[in-house]
Amino acid sequence: MTNILSPEKSENDQELPIRPSYLQEFVGQQQIKENLLVFIKAAKSRNEHLDHTLFYGPPGLGKTTLAKIISNEIGGNFKSTAGPAIIKAADLAAILTNLEKNDVLFIDEIHRLNTLVEEILYSAMEDFELDIIIGEGSAARSVKITLPKFTLIGATTRFGMLSNSLRDRFGIPMRLNFYNTEELKQVLNRASKLLDIDLTDSGSEEIAKRSRGTPRIALRLLRRIRDFAVVDGKLRIDKEICDFGLKRLTVDSIGLDSNDYRYLKFIADNYHGGPVGIETIAAALSEQRDELEETIEPYLIKIGLVKRTPRGRVITIAAFEHLKMPIPNKSQHQFNILNENE
């Protein structure tokens, strides 16, 4: 699924020269920032490495950025890879043996590590040792390699898919949450200054309200609205040009797009509001289940349009009202039951 409101990273997002380098520049996630400052300061004062850190939560909230910031704050090199890229034990060994003291190894999508690689990672995280097999057959022998004290930072959007053994080895687990409108305005205002964009307060507010609580989406929308402003001869990005551009991008007043409407209308039209299983929804919409669970559902659940139940997905009264559709009696009964159980 590729669209303007996808929280997943795209190649175009990487061109923005606005990534903060230190915690004081990072907007939002205030409690995480404050705690990280304490943990980093304490590790430095003891002349120790920072404990292994796990960032989890919806995509687009700053997990990679925070990993790079930690590297800058502790003064180590930053090495980056992804779970699916580490196929064999030898791949992991090559990465680990090239680390230096206080380096940060960032593994994105760490929930996608295969079991064999994950088991080798345990001793590297706990004991800073790596056991590798040299040779084959009867000539094979195990060699223990001592690793420098490094910090592993894992990132995942699927916390529940991590094994307990891997989760327990992270001394600093941190959940990143969606941003509120004011925080997104701060992100946009900072970016507009760095990109030399004249963004009004009303324009910033309009983009922030429709960015699904996600900085990556807010910055992407800012770039696209800048395009509309340039072509339209506008020197300033205000509420009017934002509203025009966002309508052209089919982003509605609360940040929903055509993919969200397809999802909601399928449940409303075909199942009277639900419940309906996620596999059925994915098949009907020709989407992967993971895509729905990671890019569409989190925001719809956050704003109260969808509920996950043991029997499947249910859309709420608020969803019917936003769709401007009548509420079926069957669904009304289900909503009453759900509300009583909350």
Swiss-Prot record:
Top-tier EC class: hydrolase
Q: Where does the UniProt entry say this protein principally localizes?
A: cytoplasm
Keywords assigned: ATP-binding, Cytoplasm, DNA damage, DNA recombination, DNA repair, DNA-binding, Hydrolase, Nucleotide-binding
User: One matching Pfam family, short form?
Assistant: RuvB_N
Small ATPAse domain (RuvB-S) as annotated region, ranges: 180-250
So where does ATP get bound?
I18, R19, G60, K63, T64, T65, E126, D127, F128, R169, Y179, R216
Positions of the region Large ATPase domain (RuvB-L)? 1-179
Q: Supply one GO molecular-function term.
A: four-way junction helicase activity
Q: Which SUPFAM superfamilies match?
A: P-loop containing nucleoside triphosphate hydrolases, Winged helix' DNA-binding domain
Compartments in which it is found: Cytoplasm
So where does Mg(2+) get bound? T64
Residues that bind DNA: R289, R308, R313
Annotated region (Head domain (RuvB-H)) at 253-342
Query: What InterPro entries does the database record attribute to this sequence?
Result: AAA+_ATPase, AAA_lid_4, DNA_helicase_Holl-junc_RuvB, P-loop_NTPase, RuvB-like_N, RuvB_C, WH-like_DNA-bd_sf, WH_DNA-bd_sf
Q: Name one GO biological process term.
A: DNA recombination
Gene Ontology cellular component terms for the protein in this record: cytoplasm; Holliday junction resolvase complex
The record's family statement is: Belongs to the RuvB family.
HAMAP family, per database record: DNA_HJ_migration_RuvB
Quaternary state and interactors: Homohexamer. Forms an RuvA(8)-RuvB(12)-Holliday junction (HJ) complex. HJ DNA is sandwiched between 2 RuvA tetramers; dsDNA enters through RuvA and exits via RuvB. An RuvB hexamer assembles on each DNA strand where it exits the tetramer. Each RuvB hexamer is contacted by two RuvA subunits (via domain III) on 2 adjacent RuvB subunits; this complex drives branch migration. In the full resolvosome a probable DNA-RuvA(4)-RuvB(12)-RuvC(2) complex forms which resolves the HJ.
The task this protein performs is described as: The RuvA-RuvB-RuvC complex processes Holliday junction (HJ) DNA during genetic recombination and DNA repair, while the RuvA-RuvB complex plays an important role in the rescue of blocked DNA replication forks via replication fork reversal (RFR). RuvA specifically binds to HJ cruciform DNA, conferring on it an open structure. The RuvB hexamer acts as an ATP-dependent pump, pulling dsDNA into and through the RuvAB complex. RuvB forms 2 homohexamers on either side of HJ DNA bound by 1 or 2 RuvA tetramers; 4 subunits per hexamer contact DNA at a time.
Name the record gives this protein: Holliday junction branch migration complex subunit RuvB
